[in-house]
């Protein structure tokens, strides 16, 4: 929603239901919705409301046959993450570890398709069946948990996942924490390829500390 719809107090569920009855929307076409007025909170608040609304739409009334751990996967919820390179790194790390996972919001290919003359409509992304199967995962990791209070509450209370607390996988220490938590949940070892990658980062930090230690920097943009 936008501000005007929230000020008026539109009943989105009824609006969508009436549109189905009148034939504007096919009966079997999913239309999730979320309340995201811009006068409440920030972009991250809206993202949390959006994700919780989608998760609720696809799973709340379909929990009868769901069982925690049944699909052997780990769910990842990135939060309001705008740098698409981070998604690709996460995909690569999980593939190298051999971990079964679902990235429950994955705009990588949708927002970053190549300029090669080919038309790709809705390329990539998270499939609907992944979203519907999410409660069957072993657990769900929220990668920016301070942004996602509504999502955390829904996943804990409805999906019955533990949602362990972790820091955003950024930098050496927090990426270590992330990978070790994934290893603990999945039972998969962290491969030598990622250990070597970590070692190169430590080597780079050691080599450059003479020039960077104690220095202040400013970031713009």
Regions found by a protein language model. Give the residues of each.
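An N-terminal assembly and electron-transfer interface module characteristic of large anaerobic redox
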Residues: 1-221
């Amino acid at each position: 929603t936008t501000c005007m719809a929230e000020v008026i107090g539109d009943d989105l569920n009824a609006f969508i239901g009436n549109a189905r009855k009148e034939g504007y929307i096919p009966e079997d076409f999913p239309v999730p919705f979320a309340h995201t007025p811009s006068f409440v909170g920030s972009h991250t608040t809206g993202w949390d409301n959006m994700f919780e609304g989608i998760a609720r739409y696809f799973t709340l009334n379909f929990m009868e046959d769901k069982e925690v751990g049944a699909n052997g996967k780990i769910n990842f919820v990135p939060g309001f993450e705008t740098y698409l390179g981070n998604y690709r790194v996460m995909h690569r790390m999980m593939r190298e570890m051999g971990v079964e996972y679902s990235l429950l919001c994955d705009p990588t290919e949708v927002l970053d398709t190549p300029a090669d003359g080919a038309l790709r409509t809705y390329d990539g992304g998270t499939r609907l069946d992944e979203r519907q199967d999410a409660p069957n995962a072993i657990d769900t990791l929220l990668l920016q948990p301070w942004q996602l209070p509504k999502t955390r509450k829904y996943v804990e209370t409805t999906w019955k996942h533990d949602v362990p607390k972790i820091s955003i996988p950024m930098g050496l220490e927090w990426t270590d924490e992330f990978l070790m938590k994934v290893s603990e949940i999945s039972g998969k070892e962290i491969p030598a390829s990622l250990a070597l990658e970590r070692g190169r980062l430590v080597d780079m930090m050691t080599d450059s500390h003479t020039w960077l230690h104690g220095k202040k920097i400013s970031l713009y943009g």
